[in-house]
């Protein structure tokens, strides 16, 4: 299910008997927080954190996607410096001009891990404004 979006199709296999046939397997990383860092030309233009929707009720904290009651928020979001650093490094290594990097932070070992780079991230609200401003500056330099 490599063409899925929004975290749909995720299966957590806690033991070998839970495995299902698929095209991609990845290790689960315990996390305290999950962030989306929007980057253009090496600069952070927007920072969001995944949070439980107020009306979500009981949720599965391992799979933090929209269908499971999570949304991206930007109010009062502060991340460890390593979250921004690994996001910028991932963009640099991938040679992409812009994208939204999903990063989880494990506070037990104080490490940030890149989950993926979204090359066509969903944009709405203030994120659209931030991208428009950043692209204007980028194209006018």
Question: Residue ranges of each PLM-predicted region?
Answer:
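Hydrophobic residue at the +6 position relative to the catalytic HRD Asp in the kinase catalytic loop
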Residues: 101-103
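Short amphipathic alpha-helical surface patches that serve as generic macromolecular interface elements
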Residues: 80-88, 111-114
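Active-site nucleotide/adenylate-binding loops and adjacent lid/helix of ATP-dependent enzymes
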Residues: 1-35, 40-45, 77-85, 138-141
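Flexible internal linker/loop segments at domain or repeat junctions
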Residues: 54-77
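Short beta->alpha transition motifs characteristic of CBS
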Residues: 43, 47-54, 117-122
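Short, charged, surface-exposed secondary-structure boundary motifs
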Residues: 7-11, 56-57, 126-129
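Generic structural signal for well-ordered beta-strand positions
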Residues: 45, 60, 113-115
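C-terminal active-site "lid" helix and adjoining low-complexity regulatory extension at the edge
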Residues: 92-96, 105-141
